[in-house]
Amino acid sequence: MARITPVSQYRNIGISAHIDAGKTTTTERILFYTGINHKIGEVHDGAATMDWMEQEQERGITITSAATTTFWSGMSKQFLPHRINIIDTPGHVDFTIEVERSMRVLDGAVMIYCAVGGVQPQSETVWRQVNKYNVPRIAFINKMDRMGANFFNVVKQMNERLGIDPVPIQIPINSEENFSGVIDLIRMKAIYWDDLDKGITFKYDNIPSDLTVLSDRWRQKLIESAVENDDFLMDKYLTGKKLSEYEIKNSLRQRVLNNEIVLITCGSAFKNKGVQALLDAIVEYLPSPMDVASYNVKKISQKSNSKKSCSSNMDLSNDQEAFVALAFKIATDPFVGNLTFFRVYSGKVSSGDVIYNSVKKKKERFGRIVQMHANKREEIKEVRAGDIAAAIGLKSVTTGDTLCDPNNVVVLEKMDFPDPVISIAVEPKTKIDQEKMSVALNRLAKEDPSFKVHTDRESNQTIISGMGELHLEIIVDRMRREFGVGANIGQPQVSYRETIQSSVKNVEGKYIKQSGGRGQYGHVVIDLFPLKPLNQSGYIFINDIKGGIIPGEYISAIDKGIQEQLLYGPLAGYSVVDIGVRLHFGSYHDVDSSEIAFKLAASLAFKSAFKKANPVLLEPIMKVEVETPEEYMGDVIGDLNRRRGMIEGMIDLSIGKSIRAQVPLSCMFGYATDVRSQTQGRASYSMEFLKYSEAPVHVASSIIQNRDKN
């Protein structure tokens, strides 16, 4: 089957924002104006197409990323039909994994900001994730009709808080209840959308006389940005010659693709104004897969069992290249089972083809391929370079796996996922629930790499861990609704970590057992040292054995014995991070030595060394931002101080003050209720994981004592 839409007319984009910035409402308008939906679904009615989960409809928030495909030919039908693959991502920090894995496979992003709230904490988190993958982006300042809306203040915040060069290509015509349209700074025309047909029709008009000076000033900034990195256009500009619309747009596009600037549009999605112009900007300024081929993909060849890195040279515009794709999400569908979402980077694949999972080193056969529209499926026969689709029936694939042609084995750059910071115990109510719970938790863990399940070795309880209270609340709710599991839920527990502050040398571990017959003998000597800076994931094992004093076949058993101890630290049973181990001496017995003996000897050496190396407990520190009316500022700050918070600063807002602080997670349980009480329900807050830091001595002692009692 021949390609219908050229790759140059593809736009793979993500839509991201802080919670309540109007992200899903904007996506719903996109689906309406592009003809996918014939009726607008509203978030507040629980009818948004992209928020299809029951929990999303009940809470009015996005929980899981949803994908869809649509086509756009321009407000004035000025383009050839462009295929836009959209992933709508969550705004709540507890579901940041959805943003992370979406940005890994997207070519461009639309960042949405509230014209009242401006650049909020999750906006900054998402910005860092987009930066991580070098994704070009444009911005849409939404809710221009809201009381307190201030377009220019948000542009200023983007410069100050995100450290970027924002370049408006539109400015609003008035704001709040008087917001009526936008001024196109390239055409220098006003655009008004018709309220009667929900903004489907529009007209260009002259710029209102009271806005001509302001428009000229922002137009000047736009032109200066367009010519900044183009010598030809700069000469033309300096000699007073007029730049064409094509020259301006082409230069701005190149700067967007190079991540030098962020173009700003504006409107009110709820009032059906500005989203159509945003779609035009997506087509005109964001990249096609061809534009990002040179830096978005890291290719690793595998030959003779050795990995060899090479520069990215896949031709993303050529369907005849070997098939390469990345699985970026696993979802459980009640009707078809596992759905594997994947992005095709080169070549093509058809249903029934055999592909190779180069991470798992397994061949699998593609069953059915479907195009997703939120939770609806449209079966298709094949997908090609640039496509985003889902496969039914792949059994061994997990998030981050590379899928490729068995005759052209490559591995794409892996995806990194955050470690959980909060845990709760779950206990099935009945024997039947116990069997179902195991299946449910395993499936949910396969879907979400930031969700972990383990059994506490002391209490034998099932412990689930995630990114926050809401994250775990949703997991438990899904377990109940989708899998019919009844469970009792424990109190939230903080995921502490253990590490060391000092180095110790020549610590011996010896395991000898003689009880008739063949004995056991393992003997190791290790050095233990801390890794800096604290990154909560580091472990290094250095094998410095010389002359075969410990045979090579036992080295991996020694490493494994130490790694098993890292799961349950000697201090309080929490996982151990940021340590290095050097194995440099030991001995063995010709008859009695075995892998198990050396594994046990290594664990004994590690425990002994750890206790001598000035061990400390690390606690998760959260970045907290509270927005409150000014009259409650003192109460809010006082309460944060009582929670061992460290105030970082304050920012003036139209509604009052924004207070930024670092607070231990253990002190933030129940904060939502307390801050509402202190401010008569008028404050709001957001919280996200920032770092691990050494817990104060009295806090660590209390935690260790409580663990010992239990």
From Swiss-Prot:
Cellular component per GO, a single term:
cytoplasm
An MF annotation (GO) of this entry: GTPase activity
For whether the record's keyword set contains GTP-binding, the answer is yes
Compartment(s) where it occurs, according to its Swiss-Prot or TrEMBL record = Cytoplasm
Classify the source by domain of life: Bacteria
**Pfam family of this protein, just one?**
GTP_EFTU
Q: Does the keyword Transport apply?
A: no
Gene3D superfamilies assigned to the protein according to its UniProt record, in alphabetical order: 3.30.230.10, 3.30.70.240, Elongation Factor G (Translational Gtpase), domain 3 (3.30.70.870), P-loop containing nucleotide triphosphate hydrolases (3.40.50.300), Translation factors (2.40.30.10)
Q: Mind listing the UniProt keywords for this protein, alphabetically?
A: Cytoplasm, Elongation factor, GTP-binding, Nucleotide-binding, Protein biosynthesis
Which parts of the sequence belong to the tr-type G domain?
8-290
Q: What is its main location?
A: cytoplasm
Give the residues the record marks as binding GTP: 17-24, 88-92, 142-145
**Any one Gene Ontology BP term:** ribosome disassembly
Question: Which family is annotated?
Answer: Belongs to the TRAFAC class translation factor GTPase superfamily. Classic translation factor GTPase family. EF-G/EF-2 subfamily.
Q: What is this protein called?
A: Elongation factor G
Protein source organism: Buchnera aphidicola subsp. Baizongia pistaciae (strain Bp)
Q: Gene encoding this polypeptide?
A: fusA
